[in-house]
Every structure is written in structure tokens, then in C-alpha cells.
């Protein structure tokens, strides 16, 4: 009995070895991007900048080892746009990751007819379903935020947490409808922050590099699953509440809109059937992808303006000239505030929402910049690295909003990704940047705390999705514009 078992084992080893050699032989025939030596690249503390440094030696496209596979890193706008715009179908896939709800997830779901239907419904719910209410909602909640900050009477404030609560509240109203009571909102906000903190922990991130470690005891992974259960409980309760009160042809929020969209698609028997779980994961993606990311960008903007009070003063002069405090702030008229829009663009260039876009997967054999890219290769666009390219940007590390005021001088920045995988929440995030910063600078002067300490502009060690700023405090000094001056200002409405 022992001999047949050994023969079977040898046969399996022979087949595995033959398959590996066949795969290597096929790769030897290809013109692959250069391979960066070493195995510990993803353990670097400031990963996007480190990867861009490798590009200075190897070129804008190269390979690095990630566990047992190679990953291709793109470090220039040209290579990113070729892959994600010109050849978007070839690179629209997603690799399998730790969170396994791949058939229902939007941000990490693989490319398919179902995924396309899911993306179309979710984007329609945000852009069309909430078209008339999204802008007034952001304005209202921002005004309430400013009133809360005014009550601080110039005291030092941990601004990131306040921004995070604001963005969570906006998403909550868009998805769940009526404003949540403070207890439920705080519970939702804490759940989202805890979930992201657990996800970004090294003990979880390493599982995508060394997958077999997930079979060993891992307190970090256990915490992540606990927070996922809490998240799902909150969303499922809201789905049930919405189904119980749903009226055909009417909607008050995104969940209503998407639930009816799923029913219509089911009745029409369209390809790529959607289910209630897809609605669930759309809500999850909005909270996870739109709370801390937007709050982090707003925090970076405040930090840069504390370091550059002269730019803050120019922004306030622009707002005082073009926008009366009591006037309606319309996003369609945003170009009446060119310096504000340039400042937002510069913050997004230096500190992009997601510095390294979520990984893509080659759905077929293709090429980028003349290099062969085999099917199923993982592609990582290094957006922050591309934004630091001296061949494209003058003084790329300098905070200089005026670069965007020079006509024709500023290339497109793929801050929210591009092509089929462009971020679902981009319209909401851009609206929030515009409204929150406009109202904040119109209402307050940003000052350092009494001891004069300025925030660090160096990101925390990069281990997850977001580029996080070290905690800091700011004083929001009310400006108290004179009523007679306010009446002389024009309106962007």
C-alpha cells in the first residue's frame, strides 16, 4: 500500500513541476518589465514615494515580488492612462483579496456583467437618484458643522475627527435617508473607523502577501471580522426598515432607489442579475470609501494652509469678493472661485485620496509601454508617485496652487482612478471638498494652537489604503464679517 501512495505523490509532484516549468518557459519568451531586486518592498514606511524612487532607476513601469507572484507597478500618468483608459477592458479585473464577498463587492469585485450592472445601478443612485438633494444636504450639514465649530470659541480642535463625523453624517443621510439620531450616527462612525483601522493593520495586510498565514491564530484578523459583523448588522437593519416602507416609484435615499432598481432588473431578466446583497455592499463601499478618505483630504488641506497663511489669506479674499455668507453655494459655479479650485487640486496632487489605486488584474494578455503583461498579472497604479514626476511637474514637492491657474499647464490627475474603475463616490467627494473648504474659510481663520505647533506634513507610515496625516489641532477663529460688507459681495448662486 505504501508504494502506490509514493508513486501517486511523485506523479503529482511531476505534474506540478511540469506546469511550473511550462509557465516559466512561456514567460521567458515575453518582454516583461524590469524586475526590482529584493522581496521586502511592500514593508517600506512611505510606500508610494519609495516605489516612485525605484522608478528613477528602473523606469516608470517595473515588476516587484509580492509573495509568490510578480506585481507590475505603474509610476507615470502616461502608463496609468494607457492601462486604465486606453486599454481599460484589458485591466478592469480585480485580484482575489482577503475579504471574500467578491461576487457582491463593488470596489473589489471582479469585472463581469454582474459587476457592470452593479456599478451602473450604484452610480445612478448617487448621481441621478440623489441629484436634487445631494448638494443642499452637503451645504446644510456643513453649515451645522460650522456652527458647532463656532461654539468652540477659538479653542484648539482635533479637526480630523470632526471632518470624519461630518463626512459619515453626509453619507448616512444619502444612504439611510432621515438624519440618524446621535447615538446611531456615532455607532456607525465608530464602526467605520474601527473597521478601517483593523483593515490597515500590518497583521491583516500581510495576509494578502503571505496567504497561508490566515490559517494561523491572528488577533488582528479576528478584530476585523468582528467589526465586519457590526457593520453588516447596521446595514441589514436599515435595509429591512427600507423594505418595510418602500413605495413603488418613489425614493427618498439611495437604498430606496437601489432596491427598486434590483426589482426592475429582476423583472426584466437583464444579464448580470443583482440581489439585495449588492445593495448592501454598495452602502458599505460608500461608508468605507467615503468617510475617512474625504476627511483625510480635508485635514491635509487645513494642514497645508496652516503652513501657508499667505495662501489662506488670498483664499479668504477671493471668497469675500465672490461669495456672500448668506448666498447659496452652487457647485456648477465653482470656477468663479479659481484659487479655491486650484488649492483643492494641489492638495489632491500632493496627498491623493488613495495614493496607490486599488490593484487591478489583467483580464487577458496585453501590453503597457511596449512590455508584455500576461493574463492575471496584478497591476498597481502609483498615483502619488506619478504626481511627483519632475518631467511633468515643476517643483513637484512644493505646495503651489498657482500651478493650476496657468492655462494649459496642468495635466490631468487620476486622483480617483480612471476608466471603468473610477471611484463611485468621486462626484460626492469633489462636492464635499468644495463646499466644506469654502464655508470653513469663509467663516473662520485657521490658526495653530496657542503653542504655535504646526502639523507635520509627513504622512503616517503607509500600511493600508489611505494616506493618513499625523493627529494635529487647529484653532478656528471666527471671522465675524461686518453685515454692511456682506451686502456688497456677489453670489455664486
From Swiss-Prot:
Progesterone binds at residue 231. GO terms for molecular function: 17-hydroxyprogesterone 21-hydroxylase activity; heme binding; iron ion binding; progesterone 21-hydroxylase activity; steroid 21-monooxygenase activity; steroid binding. It is an enzyme of class 1 (oxidoreductase). The keyword Iron applies. SUPFAM superfamilies: Cytochrome P450 (SSF48264). The gene is Cyp21. It is a peripheral membrane protein. It catalyses: progesterone + reduced [NADPH--hemoprotein reductase] + O2 = 21-hydroxyprogesterone + oxidized [NADPH--hemoprotein reductase] + H2O + H(+); 17alpha-hydroxyprogesterone + reduced [NADPH--hemoprotein reductase] + O2 = 11-deoxycortisol + oxidized [NADPH--hemoprotein reductase] + H2O + H(+). Keywords: Endoplasmic reticulum, Heme, Iron, Lipid-binding, Membrane, Metal-binding, Microsome, Monooxygenase, Oxidoreductase, Steroid-binding, Steroidogenesis. GO terms for cellular component: endoplasmic reticulum membrane. This is Steroid 21-hydroxylase. InterPro entries: Cyt_P450, Cyt_P450_CS, Cyt_P450_E_grp-I, Cyt_P450_sf. Heme b binds at residues 94, 119, 360, 421, 423. Its EC number is 1.14.14.16. The keyword Endoplasmic reticulum applies. 17alpha-hydroxyprogesterone binds at residue 231. A cytochrome P450 monooxygenase that plays a major role in adrenal steroidogenesis. Mechanistically, uses molecular oxygen inserting one oxygen atom into a substrate, and reducing the second into a water molecule, with two electrons provided by NADPH via cytochrome P450 reductase (CPR; NADPH-ferrihemoprotein reductase). Belongs to the cytochrome P450 family. The lineage of its organism: Eukaryota, Metazoa, Chordata, Craniata, Vertebrata. Gene3D superfamilies: Cytochrome P450.
Amino acid at each position: 500500500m505504501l508504494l502506490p501512495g509514493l508513486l501517486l505523490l511523485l506523479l503529482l509532484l511531476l505534474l506540478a513541476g511540469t506546469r511550473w516549468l511550462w509557465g516559466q518557459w512561456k514567460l521567458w519568451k515575453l518582454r516583461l518589465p524590469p524586475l526590482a531586486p529584493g522581496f521586502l518592498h511592500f514593508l517600506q514606511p512611505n510606500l508610494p514615494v519609495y516605489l516612485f524612487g525605484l522608478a528613477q532607476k528602473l523606469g516608470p513601469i517595473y515588476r516587484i515580488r509580492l509573495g509568490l507572484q510578480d506585481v507590475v507597478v505603474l509610476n507615470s500618468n502616461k502608463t496609468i492612462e494607457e492601462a486604465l483608459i486606453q486599454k481599460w477592458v484589458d485591466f478592469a479585473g480585480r485580484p482575489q483579496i482577503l475579504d471574500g464577498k467578491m461576487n457582491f463587492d463593488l470596489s473589489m469585485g471582479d469585472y463581469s456583467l454582474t459587476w457592470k450592472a452593479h456599478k451602473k445601478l450604484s452610480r445612478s443612485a448617487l448621481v441621478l437618484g440623489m441629484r436634487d438633494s445631494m448638494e443642499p444636504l452637503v451645504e446644510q450639514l456643513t453649515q451645522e458643522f460650522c456652527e458647532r465649530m463656532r461654539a468652540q470659541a477659538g479653542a484648539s480642535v482635533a479637526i480630523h475627527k470632526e471632518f470624519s463625523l461630518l463626512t459619515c453624517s453626509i453619507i448616512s443621510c444619502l444612504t439611510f435617508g432621515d438624519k440618524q439620531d446621535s447615538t446611531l450616527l456615532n455607532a456607525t462612525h465608530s464602526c467605520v473607523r474601527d473597521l478601517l483601522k483593523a483593515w490597515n493593520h500590518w497583521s491583516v495586510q500581510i495576509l494578502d502577501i503571505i496567504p497561508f498565514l490566515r490559517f494561523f491564530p491572528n488577533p488582528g484578523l479576528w478584530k476585523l471580522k468582528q467589526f465586519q459583523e457590526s457593520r453588516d448588522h447596521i446595514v441589514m437593519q436599515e435595509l429591512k426598515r427600507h423594505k418595510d416602507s418602500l413605495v413603488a416609484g418613489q425614493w427618498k435615499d439611495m437604498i430606496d432607489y437601489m432596491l427598486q432598481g434590483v426589482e426592475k432588473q429582476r423583472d426584466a431578466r437583464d444579464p448580470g442579475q443583482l440581489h439585495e446583497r449588492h445593495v448592501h455592499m454598495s452602502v458599505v463601499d460608500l461608508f468605507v470609501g467615503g468617510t475617512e478618505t474625504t476627511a483625510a483630504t480635508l485635514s491635509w488641506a487645513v494642514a497645508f494652509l496652516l503652513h501657508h497663511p499667505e495662501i489662506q489669506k488670498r483664499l479668504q479674499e477671493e471668497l469675500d469678493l465672490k461669495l456672500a455668507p448668506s448666498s447659496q453655494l452652487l457647485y456648477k459655479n465653482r470656477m468663479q472661485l479659481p484659487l479655491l479650485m486650484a488649492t483643492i487640486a494641489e492638495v489632491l496632487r500632493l496627498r491623493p485620496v488613495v495614493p496607490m489605486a486599488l490593484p487591478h488584474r489583467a483580464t487577458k494578455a496585453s501590453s503597457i509601454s511596449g512590455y508584455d503583461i500576461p493574463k492575471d498579472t496584478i497591476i498597481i497604479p502609483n498615483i502619488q508617485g506619478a504626481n511627483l514626476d519632475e518631467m511633468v511637474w515643476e517643483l513637484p514637492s512644493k505646495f503651489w496652487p498657482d500651478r493650476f491657474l496657468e492655462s494649459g499647464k496642468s495635466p490631468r490627475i487620476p486622483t480617483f482612478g480612471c476608466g471603468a474603475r473610477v471611484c463611485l463616490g468621486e462626484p460626492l467627494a469633489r462636492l464635499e471638498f468644495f463646499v466644506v473648504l469654502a464655508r470653513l474659510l469663509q467663516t473662520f481663520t485657521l490658526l495653530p494652537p496657542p503653542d504655535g505647533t504646526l502639523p507635520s506634513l509627513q504622512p503616517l507610515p503607509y500600511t493600508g489604503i489611505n494616506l493618513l496625516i499625523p493627529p494635529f489641532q487647529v484653532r478656528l477663529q471666527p471671522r465675524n464679517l461686518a453685515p454692511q460688507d456682506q451686502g456688497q459681495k456677489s453670489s455664486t448662486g
